[in-house]
């Protein structure tokens, strides 16, 4: 019963589970077992070394020397180089031809430009306009003489006689002015009452006080240095 239950987990050889033979696990006897890659690599190396030895022997042999001499005489190298160069130039020529064909195809796709038709310009002559007629006024005859008359201004004496006597007026404007009636002519002299009073300096009523000298060292210092200027504050209204 236990073998049946664990047979699914056991390694298999094909379709048969391996329940007892555990020694064969991981060997080439199993399906998909180990593979010796080292042997394959060593075989490849041995085959390569053998090919190299065979080639060197053939190259250094008398037959190889004769073959090389024959190749030099027939100029095989030059022919190979010429063939390669001609092939390269031919490939370049083919590429240039293909590019030219592509350019021509793209140019053919565009619609051809229509030639510009020059428009015939017809010069239209402007109709001759009728000349303008301007009527000029008739000129006066030269025999006529112009006579200009002008009234001469009156003389100064006549003007003074016709003028009214100069009388002082009450208003500056002539329409508002009225004559001032007085026995004596007015003058610009000021009245005695209008004259300003004579200037008289005001005498100060402040008593003059002499500085009081203190006794002791303060008085001695005042005698040496002096009391200086007296400062008097006065308030005046202008």
Curated annotation (Swiss-Prot):
All late proteins expressed from the major late promoter are produced by alternative splicing and alternative polyadenylation of the same gene giving rise to non-overlapping ORFs. A leader sequence is present in the N-terminus of all these mRNAs and is recognized by the viral shutoff protein to provide expression although conventional translation via ribosome scanning from the cap has been shut off in the host cell. Residues 36-53 are annotated as: Involved in endosomal membrane lysis. Residues 1-33 form a propeptide. This is Pre-protein VI. The record marks 33-34, 227-228 as: Cleavage. N-terminal amphipathic alpha-helix domain is essential for the membrane lytic activity. GO terms for biological process: lysis of host organelle involved in viral entry into host cell; microtubule-dependent intracellular transport of viral material towards nucleus; viral release from host cell. Residues 34-54 are annotated as: Amphipathic alpha-helix essential for membrane lytic activity. Residues 48-74, 221-227 are annotated as: Interaction with hexon protein. Ubiquitinated by Nedd4 following partial capsid disassembly; which might play a role in intracellular virus movement during entry.
């Amino acid at each position: 019963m236990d073998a049946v239950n664990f047979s699914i987990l056991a390694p298999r050889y094909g379709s048969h589970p391996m329940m007892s033979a555990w020694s064969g696990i991981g060997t080439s006897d199993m399906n998909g077992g180990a593979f010796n890659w080292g042997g394959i690599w060593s075989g490849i190396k041995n085959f390569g070394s053998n090919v190299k030895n065979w080639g060197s022997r053939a190259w250094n042999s008398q037959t190889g020397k004769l073959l090389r001499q024959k190749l030099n005489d027939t100029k095989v190298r030059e022919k190979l180089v010429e063939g390669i160069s001609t092939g390269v130039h031919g490939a370049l020529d083919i590429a240039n031809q293909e590019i030219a064909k592509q350019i021509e195809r793209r140019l053919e796709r565009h619609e051809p430009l229509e030639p510009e038709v020059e428009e015939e310009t017809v010069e239209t002559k402007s109709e001759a306009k009728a000349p303008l007629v301007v009527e000029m006024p008739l000129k006066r005859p030269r025999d006529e003489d112009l006579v200009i008359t002008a009234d001469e201004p009156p003389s100064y004496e006549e003007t003074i006689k016709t003028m009214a006597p100069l009388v002082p007026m009450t208003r500056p404007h002539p329409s508002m002015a009225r004559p001032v009636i007085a026995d004596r002519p007015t003058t610009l002299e000021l009245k005695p009452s209008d004259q300003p009073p004579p200037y008289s300096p005001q005498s100060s009523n402040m008593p003059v006080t002499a500085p009081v000298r203190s006794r002791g060292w303060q008085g001695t210092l005042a005698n040496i240095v002096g009391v200086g200027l007296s400062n008097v504050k006065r308030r005046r209204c202008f």
